[in-house]
């Protein structure tokens, strides 16, 4: 039992830190360019537009000034899960941050091979 807890303790600590640090965003609304990329972006609100997310004309059609299909795909998925509720989008971002934190820990652990980071 003690060995098992020793192995998962860093993951629990990193998860708790990520959640604590980013949880203050949960009650915030959309900001900055979210009105263009999410709130007023009709292309993320219909399955008929799914293929357009990956087209090179997306940034012209959407009003965005950049072509970021993976980011836009997350907006598309978020919209169908949460609707236009910013809290859901923030929750997804916390989950993605947490996943990246844990992946970075695993990568560093593999690179160093010590497991004592």
PLM feature segments, named:
Residues 18-19, 26, 91:
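Acyl-group handoff/entry surfaces in thioester-processing enzymes
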Residues 25-83:
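Extracytosolic (periplasmic/ER-lumenal) interhelical loops and adjacent juxtamembrane/interface segments
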Residues 104-117:
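Transmembrane-helix signature of polytopic, membrane-embedded enzymes
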Residues 1-20, 110:
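Start-transfer (signal-anchor) and selected internal transmembrane alpha helices
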Residues 23, 101-105:
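Alpha-helical transmembrane segments of polytopic integral membrane proteins
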Residues 69, 83-102:
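Loop-to-helix entry region of an early transmembrane alpha helix in multi-pass inner-membrane enzymes
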Residues 16, 33-34, 74, 93, ...:
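Generic structural signal for small/hydrophobic residues in well-ordered secondary structure
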Residues 6-14, 68, 72, 89-90:
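Residue-level signature of transmembrane alpha-helical entry/exit and packing/kink sites
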